[in-house]
């Protein structure tokens, strides 16, 4: 017979009765001296942390990444040097706008983030399933998210709010075309693609720099839902994507994605009619070919969702040697914001949590703060110092010098905005069925939207392709010709 496992308080003291509070007699009031009761209630009151302001609803899993082709000609990142190198990873998939317990069938971009625990420290890939974003400058990030979030007076999402914002933000048009395609309602997390959205810099041992974008392609294929299919699933189940991922891994049907890199030589940066570092612009595969990097396999579910999936923190600025951020204006803002939100949400020592802690050794002078549990014990907590046993800076890891483009500082309008050119490319690449789905999904979403807002959006759509605008206008009963004569 096995030894009985005692229920205890968080102080390790065994609990004799977990069913009844301590009272002053059978009919008297509860006693404040009941430590078991007070500890239990006080901890329950603090079980939750603030949910993420975006990407709150998520599912995650552990796995490994295997490098299939050496990337040493592009980057000195050690985990990408040799074929066959295995790196532990944790991946988190999410919806972007809606809350933690919202239906996973809602139209929304899907977050696609991967933490690589490399021997040189952590590397965070922080992307989405869709290859572009609504805005090109981080100063507009709070605005676009506010427009998509519920009305602060009614707590109800209102299409008038986000379509109003979109109509006055023409750079969002390409993202609209992806989001309101059926790719805005994926069938499962196992069947979504992933994109870095932003360009980054890779630097090799010779100091040569290239710009790159990264793409994840699911081996299961990209599978999406029509609006009708999503509604049918939502009527029965609003955890379908989390359940599918969990059950597939439990059953040994491990999902896999191939990672590809697209490469741009800096000397070619000005060779296009758009800015390749603009997050509202895609790098189409026929212009920027895919090169296979490796394969990710997810093979273990979290043991504790809160401690892992909910507490994991990502930042696109968490890069290893041989990688740097690009000058992308949206990316530059995210470099600050992502870690800042984790410090607010989880705490200043969130990187000490096991899910965030690197496998590589950590040695620095960052001490104390709220809830530190991996204390560094040396009495020397400053640098420079004269003690040989203390950690010292290593010039071998200084970031390579990078050319600065431009010599004027200020609030400058982005060059080559080309707000509709890539949207036109997307429209031209869509099949007849994909075009029909896009038009239908927009028309359906406009059922409660004011006519003046519809007209402003139709004017943007007209500048993408007159056929696109005319089909949406026909679906909403608007005479397009009355509103676009000045655009002809």
UniProtKB/Swiss-Prot annotation:
InterPro entries, sorted: Catalase, Catalase_AS, Catalase_clade1/3, Catalase_core, Catalase_haem_BS, Catalase_immune_responsive, Catalase_sf
GO-annotated cellular components: cytoplasm
Required co-factors: heme
Main localization of the protein described in the UniProt heading: cytoplasm
Name of the protein in question: Catalase
Biased composition (Polar residues): 7-23
EC category name: oxidoreductase
Presence of keyword Ion transport: no
Listed GO MF terms: catalase activity; heme binding; metal ion binding
Annotated region described as Disordered, given as residue ranges: 1-26
Keywords: Cytoplasm, Heme, Hydrogen peroxide, Iron, Metal-binding, Oxidoreductase, Peroxidase
Binding residues annotated for heme, in chain numbering: 338
Family the entry assigns: Belongs to the catalase family.
Function description: Decomposes hydrogen peroxide into water and oxygen; serves to protect cells from the toxic effects of hydrogen peroxide.
UniProt catalytic activity: 2 H2O2 = O2 + 2 H2O
Compartments (UniProt record): Cytoplasm
């Amino acid at each position: 017979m096995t030894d009985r496992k005692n229920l205890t308080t968080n102080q390790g003291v065994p609990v004799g009765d977990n069913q009844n509070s301590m009272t002053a007699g059978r009919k008297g009031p509860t006693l404040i001296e009941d430590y078991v009761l007070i500890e239990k209630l006080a901890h329950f009151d603090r079980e939750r942390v603030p949910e993420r302001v975006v990407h709150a609803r998520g599912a995650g899993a552990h796995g490994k990444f295997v490098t299939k082709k050496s990337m040493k000609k592009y980057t000195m990142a050690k985990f990408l040097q040799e074929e066959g190198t295995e790196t532990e990873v944790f991946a988190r998939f999410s919806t972007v706008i809606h809350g933690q317990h919202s239906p996973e069938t809602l139209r929304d971009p899907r977050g696609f983030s991967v933490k690589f625990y490399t021997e040189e420290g952590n590397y965070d890939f922080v992307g989405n399933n869709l290859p572009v974003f609504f805005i090109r400058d981080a100063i507009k990030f709070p605005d676009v998210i506010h427009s998509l979030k519920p009305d602060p007076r009614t707590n109800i999402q209102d299409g008038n709010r986000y379509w109003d914002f979109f109509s006055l933000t023409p750079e969002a048009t390409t993202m609209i075309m992806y989001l309101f395609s059926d790719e805005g309602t994926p069938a499962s997390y196992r069947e979504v693609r992933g994109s870095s959205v932003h360009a980054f810099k890779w630097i090799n041992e010779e100091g040569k720099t290239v710009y790159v974008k990264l793409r994840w392609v699911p081996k299961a294929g990209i599978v999406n839902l029509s609006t009708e299919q999503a509604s049918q699933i939502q009527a029965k189940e609003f955890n379908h994507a989390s359940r599918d991922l969990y059950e597939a891994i439990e059953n040994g049907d491990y999902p896999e994605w191939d990672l590809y890199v697209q490469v741009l030589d800096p000397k070619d940066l000005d060779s296009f009619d758009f800015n390749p570092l603009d997050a509202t612009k895609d790098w189409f595969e026929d212009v920027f070919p895919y090169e296979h990097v490796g394969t990710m396999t997810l093979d273990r579910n979290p043991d504790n969702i809160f401690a892992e999936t909910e507490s994991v923190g990502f930042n696109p600025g968490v890069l290893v040697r041989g990688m740097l951020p690009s000058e992308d204006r949206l990316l530059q803002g995210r470099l600050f914001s992502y870690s800042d939100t984790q410090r607010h949400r989880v705490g200043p020592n969130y990187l000490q949590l096991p899910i965030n802690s690197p496998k590589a050794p950590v040695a620095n002078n960052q001490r104390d703060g709220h809830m530190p549990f991996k204390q560094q014990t040396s009495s020397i907590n400053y640098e420079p110092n004269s003690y040989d046993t203390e950690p010292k800076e290593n010039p071998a890891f200084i970031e390579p010098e990078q050319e600065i483009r431009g010599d004027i500082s200020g609030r400058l309008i982005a060059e080559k905005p080309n707000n509709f050119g890539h949207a036109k490319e997307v429209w031209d690449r869509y099949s007849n069925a994909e075009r029909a789905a896009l038009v239908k999904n927009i028309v359906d979403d406009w059922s409660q939207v004011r006519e003046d807002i519809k007209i402003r959006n139709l004017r943007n759509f007209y500048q993408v392709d007159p056929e696109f605008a005319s089909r949406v206008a026909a679906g909403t009963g608007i005479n397009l010709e009355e509103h676009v004569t000045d655009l002809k």
